[in-house]
Amino acid sequence: MAAEPRSVLFDRKESGIYHCYNRCVRRASLCGEDHLTGKSYSHRKDWIADRLAYLARGFAIDVLDFCAMDNHLHLLLRNRPDLVELWNDREVAERWVHLCPSELEKLQKQQARRLASGLISATAVADVREQYLKTMMNDQTEMITLRDRLSDISWLMKLLCENIARQANREDEVTGKFWESRFQSDRILDEANALACSMYINLNPVRAQIAVAPEECSHTSLGIRMLTVRDMLLSVFGPDALHTTADDQAAMIDQADVREAANRYLDRSREEQQERLEGRRPAAEQQLALRSGS
């Protein structure tokens, strides 16, 4: 029986939860250890986590859960077209440039060369971004298209999988497919199935005997959340907090006088992560040269 087309499965105008997954070509461990050479490619799982964080800041799509394994990837995603409706044209344009900056960067490089040749002023170079955004905002047909894309799970998967494939091929100095297909997906119809899917995704490393317990899974959303809570408890209460029971730790987090400090810590962690990702951004974008609309 043929799979249901994505055009039927995904309703861009309606919020929904979807389980999306993809495998490396021939199910090879391209994000794990090469058993022939002994070389580890586990750092590519960090690429996936970092890229997801970057894309989540642009798309109107919630990354509810994810798991990066040696040879495949699981995501639990929720599209939010209702959020896109609240954004004005400038925010839509800014978000799209964040996701696909290559065309703007190309214009900026052209203007920089013209500036070096003395053909234009420094002011003209500084205005390139603003003019580029205004051109996008003045094209209402383009804006309608971009609004659809910003809550389109297919576009998030495209920009995720293409990015990882390009980086991996460049690292291996090869060409060709990295993923066996675009991706596969199932719609989650109720809360019970959403919870079951979340458990399935986060317990993948335990089931595969890569980890003994969920908190040891460094490339799952649950593992990252637990590590964040652990770091927060250490920051606020000190090392003794880690020797208490789970109930005691929950009570610590719930203490009214601690919430503000905990929130400040989490905000600082998010800012540090964003600075780290933005620090990588120029080199990564130059390498990948993603084209909007391709």
State what each model feature region is.
Residues M1-S294:
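Short catalytic/metal-binding and nucleic-acid-binding patches
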